[in-house]
Amino acid sequence: YSSAASDVYKRQLLDNDKLDIDGLERLIERLIKGGVHGLFILGTTGEAQSISYRLRHEMIKETCRINAGRLPVLVCISDTSIVESIHLAHVGAECGASAVVSAPPYYFAPGQPELAEFYEDLIPQLPLPIFLYNMPSHTKVNFAPATIQRIARNPQVVGFKDSSANAVYFQSVMYVMKDRQDFAMLVGPEEITAECVLLGGHGGINGGANMFPELYVDLYHAAVARDMETVSRLQPLVMQISSSIYTVGQHGSSYLKGLKCALSLLGVCDDFVAAPFHRFNVPEREKIRKALEALPFCPELKP
């Protein structure tokens, strides 16, 4: 995974417990055609914590079926229950996933010693390699660099995804992990992916790639090649998407709603958002339409 730029894709729903399989297939094919290096499911953008375990299992099975071994599939197994995390990992392994991804248990916030002990208990029970996943805004827990270093003594820990949006923290983790040349360092926020790759990171898991995978893949390759002219040309487009499509409504759900609405307008999938949220109404949808139309590469949109 150390040379991969993995791009996340959203879970597709028709209602709170029904998967939009046609939309999922269109999205996976769009991502593969766009050149992404991997598929990451059941993460934040995938609304995993809002759906049933039955639907999570179906999502894993359908993704692996549609992908048919073309790209590595990373399955997020984050949960408050270690038993359910292990179960999700085994479903992933049975379906042909390449690795699992795990954020800390949330609700009861563990201290750093407890966090390390949790993973030292979890990892030997997993059938696949694991990426640690830092998402402090949602879990209220932040992996200390020393904790990552301790957990990653186990070679089954193959990488780290950081969604803290803190580039200094990301560099701190890179520094303590410098002796693990096989350890992949991935970043979540697309706004700083190029920066992190230029400073030695290995890629990004970016929600915006659901809409325009070529943009994020091209930016990744430009950063790897130290092609600053291309980075300087593409980075403002990433920021244009971030500042327009993800900010409509100014709510905690604005990112999810904006991305799903955009995918609907692009003809990829339905814009249903799992409870407690709801899809954008007409005024917000029109704002997303205008934001898409303002992009220089926007195709014809759906009504």
Stretch-by-stretch model annotation:
Residues 24, 56, 60, 85, ...:
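A general structural signal for well-ordered alpha-helical segments in protein cores
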Residues 75-78, 163, 186-187, 206, ...:
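Active-site-adjacent beta-strand anchor residues
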Residues 13-142:
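Active-site beta->alpha loop and helix N-cap motifs at the rims of alpha/beta catalytic domains
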Residues 124-125, 138-242:
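Catalytic alpha/beta core domains of metabolic enzymes, predominantly
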Residues 33, 194-303:
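Structured C-terminal cap/extension of enzyme domains
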Residues 1-5, 9:
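Single conserved hydrophobic/aromatic residue that forms the stacking wall/gate
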Residues 6-7, 37-38, 72-74, 98-101, ...:
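Structural preference for beta-strand elements that scaffold enzyme active sites
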